[in-house]
Amino acid sequence: GVLMIPERRLFVGRLDGIIAASAQLVRPPRNNEAQAHSAQLTTSFVAPWARGHGLAKMLTLAVENAAREAGFRVLNLDVRETMGAAIQLYHSLGYKHFGTHPHYARVDGRYVAGLYFSKLLDEAAEPEETA
């Protein structure tokens, strides 16, 4: 399915030749001119048996590079607040947390918050606003 959707590009990470991780780069809809500069990194996942080998970082950087090459200036993503390793990775790669959704997901009958992140991809990034 995902390979047939032109707005989505699938990335996979392999460990010992076996697909162990994946992520998707999603373009905004063509009719959304105001957000044509930004793309979304979504459905990033590393199999439990393959964690700790740098696949998440490799995939994230590959998606960033593809987004940059496609002309996007901003990459957005979201993650459950319980995904500590992913959150730490995104911070280390320069992503900025800009919002929290308190009812992002339901896991085992309980709400889990979601964190929203964004990163400017162009080297001539606009300076951050100061209060």
How would you name each of these model-derived features?
Residues 1-49, 60-62, 66, 120-124, ...:
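Acetyl-CoA-dependent GNAT
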Residues 8, 112-116:
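Short hydrophobic/aromatic beta-strand or adjacent loop that forms the aromatic wall/cage
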Residues 46, 80-81:
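Short amphipathic helical patch at the helix-1/turn junction of helix-turn-helix
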Residues 54:
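Conserved G/P- and acidic residue-centered "switch" motifs that form tight phosphate/ATP-binding loops
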Residues 59, 83-86:
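Conserved short alpha-helix immediately C-terminal to the canonical SAM/SAH-binding motif I
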Residues 60, 67-78:
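Conserved GNAT acetyl-CoA-binding A-motif
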Residues 76-79, 87, 91, 96-113:
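Conserved catalytic-core motifs of GNAT/GCN5-like acyltransferases
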